[in-house]
Amino acid sequence: PQIQENLTKSNALSIPSVCPVCHQETELINENGSEFLFCPNPKCYAKKIKAFTHFVSRDALNIDGFSEATLEKFIDHGWLQKVTDIFSLSQYKEEIQNLDGFGEKSYTNLIQAIEDSKQVTLERVIYSLGIKGIGLSMAKLICRKYPLSLNEYKNLSVKELLSVDGIGEKLAESFVEYFTDSENQDLLQQLSNILTIALPEKIESNASFEGKTFVITGSLT
């Protein structure tokens, strides 16, 4: 048997008009025919937690020891305002060691994991920024087409990005919007100063094959 319709209309959920965390009015956005409820407040506490969680995740900076609960504690104590504050947590050594669930060993392991994360590939850094629609696979494609320093990406145009396989106009606009934002540029400069970023080899175009004739030998079955 299959349920085709709820005739009683019971358990119908109302769409919240405000964010339950920051109480900003929510917005419905339509992407590819699907609607998503969105909090437009860039300073929303819940979005801040998710941004930090994303930054330290396995496919991004891959910093072991940072659960979402730990990040919340650090943010609530005022130790983390922006993601680059992670790299100066050693100034709170005593306070961190005195937290519930922490001690000298946990602190040492966390600081070592933070130090290890400073050696990172370009695509992981791009992915860690949380640019709308830019997953790790797309970040890899962009970085291989344009292996630039973080500060140079602000010079890329939508037209240039559209030459990357699989990227559409909305993703290209999202990428350009992020890198041309002045606040984001400050963050990118700080990350450039902190991290040692390995650039991938540039993928060359197929222009070298233009005008050439190829003869295929053998039989086709």
Regions found by a protein language model. Give the residues of each.
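Short acidic (Asp/Glu) and glycine-rich catalytic loops that position anionic groups and cofactors
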Residues: P1, N32-G33, I49-T53, E68-A69, ...
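Cys/His-rich short segments
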Residues: Q2-D64
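Terminal amphipathic helices with adjacent charged low-complexity linkers/tails
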Residues: A12-L13, S90, G103
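Long, charge-rich boundary regions
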Residues: A46-D100
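DNA strand-break repair and replication-stress modules
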Residues: K48, F55, N98-T221
